[in-house]
Amino acid sequence: LIEEYIETVGEFGETRTTKETRAHFYEGIMYFCWAPFANYCAHHYAEYESAELDKDLPFLFLHGDNDSGKGMFLRFGARLISNGYVQEVTTGGDFVKDNIERAQASDTVFPYIVDDVAKSKIDRDIIKSYWEGKWDGSIQMPTFIFSSNDSTKPKSELRTRMKTLDFNVNFSELEEDEREAAAQIAGQADSCNLFPWFAHLF
């Protein structure tokens, strides 16, 4: 399923960097599988005096133009690690301070996934110091997965706290049957049972 989904980059998309973009899609899927274990890793890193959790536990930032498949990718990842229970993600308009603070107190390991968030909402101190001073191991805190259409990336001090993947592909010229085929491939995430297998190995 993973290979079939990543192949949509070359099969249905327009890109001059097919190999690199496929690699970024794959890295993104690996991040989704890792995301529920961020707190597990935090416990490990916190044992060291040199730990900087906000750098040791980077968020995932998907950067690309409109129609680069970021939204479908986020939904695919959410469905993949929830066996289809989570089908939609948060929109950028809901990414506000109150909701970020609720996430810090939510006691959940499922990532906070935000589609099409403005760069100005990411360039904030609450993101810069999300883990430090908030995480003490008593409750679980979700990591963040963002996508943005903004032409510029977050400022440099934020980029050290994020894994940035560029989706240099365009799916805007898809025919209806191609869109249906791509959606059908993504829909298989609901029942593939990949994440329980991955979690067991982890």
What are the roles of these predicted feature ranges?
Residues 24, 109, 153-202:
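Feature primarily recognizes SF3-like P-loop helicase cores of small DNA viruses
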Residues 43-52, 131-141, 150-155:
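Conserved Walker
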Residues 16, 53, 59, 67-68, ...:
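Conserved C-terminal RecA-like helicase domain
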Residues 33, 62-66, 116-118, 146-151:
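Short, flexible loop/turn elements at secondary-structure junctions
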Residues 1-82:
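P-loop NTPase catalytic core of nucleic-acid-dependent motor ATPases
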Residues 77-108, 124-125:
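Short glycine-rich substrate-engagement loop in P-loop NTPases that contacts/grips substrate
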Residues 99-147:
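Conserved nucleotide-sensing/catalytic segment adjacent to the nucleotide-binding pocket
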Residues 83-88, 144, 162-164:
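Conserved beta-strand scaffold positions in the cores of enzyme catalytic domains, especially
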